[in-house]
């Protein structure tokens, strides 16, 4: 997306621990590679624990300034506590991060007038929309709050986030051009990316979206900030 690597923090599985943390096939495990983009430099910095997610967000909230853009991207498992109408993100070692907790952790960014853009691919991710919208986020989720999300057929990606990422890049994983810039103005906004992803999502899921205010999602892109 043209974001400098120094501005990206990766929180994933067991972090830099060399122990096995990913299942390749039945009974076969290995340690996740730290270099995710094959440039020879490690990308994963932290294990996906509550303490580390909170630390990274806290550090960023101190560094970022008014009108900066925070992109919060989740590819993970998720769950729901139906009787409490709560959704959560599954973290490492059976920890979890609930919708209302994430809203609290993101609130300092909005208090500094920082744009927050959250794309959530986990099951039951739609349960985060209400809480995050209430604090002023742009939110796109793979599914409704009481429904699972699904992987792609035939390629190792999750369906919604694959389509969303293709929209942002204007190319898919096979280097085919993607017509996601609807108004041909040289930028794919969060609103346009969601519409493309929802339209091309082939799984049995209903992606959700909201922006507060609506105009932010219509203008916010990785190469454009709302005026």
Question: Which residues does each PLM region occupy?
Answer:
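Extracytoplasmic/secreted proteins, especially bacterial periplasmic and envelope-associated proteins
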Residues: 3, 48, 52-59, 97, ...
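Active-site-proximal C-terminal subdomain of hydrolase catalytic domains
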Residues: 116-212
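Loop/turn elements at helix/coil->beta-strand transitions in domains of secreted/extracellular proteins
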Residues: 1-8, 66-71, 111-117, 133-138
């Amino acid at each position: 997306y043209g974001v400098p690597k120094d501005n990206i923090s990766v929180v994933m599985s067991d972090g830099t621990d060399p122990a096995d943390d990913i299942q390749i096939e039945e009974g076969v495990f290995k340690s996740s590679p730290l270099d995710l983009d094959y440039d020879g430099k490690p990308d994963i910095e932290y294990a996906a624990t509550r303490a580390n997610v909170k630390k990274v967000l806290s550090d960023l909230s101190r560094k970022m300034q008014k009108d900066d853009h925070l992109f919060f991207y989740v590819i993970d498992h998720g769950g729901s506590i139906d009787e409490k109408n709560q959704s959560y993100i599954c973290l490492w070692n059976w920890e979890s991060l609930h919708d209302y907790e994430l809203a609290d952790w993101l609130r300092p960014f909005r208090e500094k007038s920082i744009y927050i853009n959250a794309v959530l691919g986990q099951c039951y991710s739609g349960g985060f929309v209400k809480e995050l919208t209430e604090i002023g986020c742009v939110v796109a989720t793979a599914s409704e709050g009481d429904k699972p999300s699904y992987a792609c057929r035939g390629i190792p990606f999750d369906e919604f986030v694959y389509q969303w990422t293709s929209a942002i890049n204007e190319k898919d994983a096979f280097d085919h051009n993607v017509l996601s810039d609807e108004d041909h103005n040289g930028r794919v906004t969060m609103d346009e990316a969601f519409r493309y992803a929802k339209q091309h999502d082939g799984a049995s899921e209903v992606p959700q979206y909201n922006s507060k205010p609506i105009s932010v999602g219509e203008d916010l892109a990785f190469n454009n900030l709302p005026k």
